[in-house]
From Swiss-Prot:
Protein name: Large ribosomal subunit protein bL27
Residue segments, region Disordered: 1-21
BP term (GO), one: translation
GO cellular component: cytosolic large ribosomal subunit
Disulfide bonds: none
Length: 85
């Protein structure tokens, strides 16, 4: 005869992998066209001059140049721009 009651099973114990989001290149860096600058969920950073925005809100360089992060406007939005040299 069993001396302990049967332990119930749990429905937890799973988790998803990290999605590798975040800033990939920082202000002042020289980057080439097509380089991914920021991977994000939603527009935490907004595209400025010579920066494109993908379907998943990924920011990427449209031209080669120096990377610039700045806050602009009444709402102090974080803009990512490229200064073409």
């Amino acid at each position: 005869m069993a001396h302990k009651k049967a332990g119930g099973s749990t429905r937890n114990g799973r988790d998803s992998r990290g999605k590798r989001l975040g800033v990939k290149h920082f202000g002042g860096e020289i980057i080439s066209a097509g380089t991914i600058i920021v991977r994000q969920r939603g527009n935490k950073f907004h595209p400025g001059k010579y920066v494109g925005c993908g379907r998943d809100h990924t920011l990427f360089a449209l031209q080669s140049g120096k990377l610039l992060f700045e806050k602009k406007g009444k709402l102090q939005r974080r803009l990512v721009s490229i200064i073409v040299e």
